[in-house]
Design a protein with these regions (language model features):
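Short beta-strand/loop motif that positions the catalytic acidic residue
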Residues: 152-154, 159-161, 165
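Short gly/ser/thr-rich secondary-structure transition/capping motifs
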Residues: 11-15, 137-144, 167
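The conserved beta1-alpha1 loop
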Residues: 32-36, 133, 161
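Conserved alpha/beta-hydrolase "acid-adjacent" motif
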Residues: 166-172
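Catalytic active-site module of serine/aspartate enzymes centered on a nucleophile-bearing elbow/loop
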Residues: 199-231
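Catalytic histidine neighborhood in serine/cysteine hydrolases
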Residues: 179-199
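Primarily recognizes the serine-hydrolase "nucleophile elbow" in alpha/beta-hydrolase
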Residues: 85-155
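Serine-hydrolase catalytic machinery in alpha/beta-hydrolase-like enzymes
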Residues: 5-102, 192-202
């Protein structure tokens, strides 16, 4: 089934499109997912992950950042990216969407980094954050870190990270997460920043790697819902 769509008004900046992948057997949670710097919400990875999570019981909503919606390759300024994330959250909630206890947000690479900055600077109206390939540092520049703001986030965080990610390996992320009170890292053996695995590595197949990504996210969201219900 094709996803539904709706428009998001990013006040004073323009409009963008969101896609809704409805869960077949809903667990009662919504995952708002942003794309990375190099590809929009219709990239095969985004579509595949969204469909698989919907099959696992999670309602998934993706959206384009404004530069992607306009057909541009260069990402917007950080304040515009953050404004788009805030508008997406507000739009989902205004449409009669989930309460904060049932809303999870995250993104692939840059999309995740931007929502982490939003969550660190404001009271975050959600139950948790999911990062698919968090860009801890630029490729080849491990000392240029992007983790200074993470301790300010007060909701549970899940980092799903490839063991070969050139923007921060799972091992590097584990060291960061060990200093955060509510963070967990799920390493994907043999995977790079795009969660692609080497065909002749003798480790996980591509399908197995993708399944582990989806299972990690679904389990994190399910656990987050259970925690809220027991309080």
């Amino acid at each position: 089934m094709d996803p539904d769509s709706f428009s998001i008004d990013v006040a004073g900046r323009g409009q963008t499109t969101a896609l809704v992948y409805r869960a077949k057997d809903p667990m009662g949670a919504t995952f708002l997912l942003a794309h990375g710097a190099g590809a929009g919400q219709t990239h095969p990875f985004m579509v595949d992950i969204s469909r698989r999570l919907a099959a696992a019981g999670v309602d998934v909503i993706t959206f384009n950042f404004l530069y992607t919606e306009r057909g541009k390759k260069m990402p917007d300024r950080v304040d515009d990216l953050e404004a788009c994330w805030r508008a997406a959250i507000a739009s989902v909630r205004a449409r009669g969407g989930p309460t904060p206890a049932r809303l999870f947000c995250g993104g692939k690479s840059m999309g995740g980094r931007i929502v982490s900055q939003v969550a660190a600077s404001n009271a975050f109206p959600g139950a948790g954050l999911v990062f698919l390939g968090y860009p801890l540092h630029p490729a080849g520049k491990p000392k240029v870190r992007r983790d200074e703001h993470l301790p300010a986030i007060d909701v549970p965080m899940l980092f799903v990270q490839g063991a070969r990610d050139s923007l921060g390996t799972a091992e590097e992320l584990s060291k960061v997460a060990s200093k955060l009170p509510r963070a967990a890292v799920v390493p994907i053996e043999g995977a790079d920043h795009s969660f692609a695995v080497l065909k002749r590595s003798g480790g996980l197949t591509q399908e197995e790697a993708t399944q582990r990504v989806v299972a990690a996210v679904a389990s994190f969201i399910r656990a987050g819902l259970s925690t809220k219900r027991t309080k």
